[in-house]
């Protein structure tokens, strides 16, 4: 019932959703490490706390954006499967059931809430990242603060 091309596309989209979920968790872990100052695996380089706090807040906002993107991609995958199986069933049995939309149909209130959360998180992420970069550059005395602190040496 599934064509090979459709199966490959659906599998690729499912892998994308899984990877995006993993990225959401990674951004969350990075944000928490930067905000709290805890670094159990010693992966985050040393930096002043003010810059670390601002970059951590930026990473937490990015995690929220990634969670919302993952959720929407999961809804899209689910709706795409429903629409494809409806279409295939109509073709197989010569049925006249109406086709389903390919995109997820969210209610107006849900769309507004998600859009507002995305816009606020995106603005907060941008402002906190630029502020964190500026704080780190000023505390190092150079725009390339990672060179001053020998992060990659």
Which residues does each predicted region cover?
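Hydrophobic alpha-helical transmembrane segments of integral membrane proteins
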Residues: 1-85, 115-143
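Cytosolic juxtamembrane amphipathic/interface segments immediately preceding
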Residues: 5, 100-114
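Juxtamembrane inter-helical linkers in multi-pass membrane proteins
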Residues: 79-106
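Membrane-proximal, acidic/low-complexity disordered segments on the non-cytosolic side
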Residues: 145-153
């Amino acid at each position: 019932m599934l064509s090979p091309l459709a199966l490959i596309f659906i599998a690729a989209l499912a892998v994308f959703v899984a990877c995006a979920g993993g990225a959401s968790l990674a951004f969350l872990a990075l944000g928490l490490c930067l905000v709290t100052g805890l670094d159990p695996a010693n992966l985050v380089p040393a930096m002043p706390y003010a810059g670390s706090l601002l970059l951590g807040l930026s990473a937490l906002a990015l995690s929220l954006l990634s969670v919302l993107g993952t959720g929407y991609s999961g809804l899209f995958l689910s709706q795409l499967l429903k629409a494809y199986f409806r279409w295939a069933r109509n073709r197989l049995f010569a049925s006249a059931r109406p086709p389903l939309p390919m995109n997820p149909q969210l209610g107006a209130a849900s769309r507004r809430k998600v859009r507002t959360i995305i816009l606020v998180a995106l603005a907060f992420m941008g402002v906190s990242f630029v502020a964190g970069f500026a704080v780190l550059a000023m505390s190092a005395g150079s725009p390339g603060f990672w060179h001053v602190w020998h992060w990659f040496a």
